[in-house]
Amino acid sequence: MTAATHEAVAVRGRWRLCGWCAAAVLAEAGLYASYRGHDARFHWFTHFFVGAATALAAMTVVVVLRRRPVARPLVWPLAAHLFAMTPDLLFTAGYAHRRWMDLFLGHISVHFVPGRNWTWLAVFLTALAAYLTAVDRRRSLASEP
């Protein structure tokens, strides 16, 4: 592969990553807007932090077991966020919240954790640090002779 071809592939990869980032941001903006009238900041952040932290924990396990980063890493937190907020989607369709909805990543219980969203932010940042550490460790092990 020539240097020019390698550079073209790298540029295409960067644009693809930008596309995934833009899609994830637009999707999350749509989810945030879906909470209008229901204390959007509190509810969106709660389920985002819980879903994304769960996804990052799963991604960390995959990195450790497969010894490489996960494919499409932005899809995992978005999918987990959607899963965590499923009871709210059901609520907008007319279904009242029930205790069994805690099956969706603790949908009801997560609102009653001491510290509320500050606690979930700390959990999210810890999960993010664990994932990035696992990815970095795998890359450094792969680059050793």
Question: What is each residue range found by the language model?
Answer:
Residues M1-P145:
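N-terminal membrane-targeting hydrophobic helices
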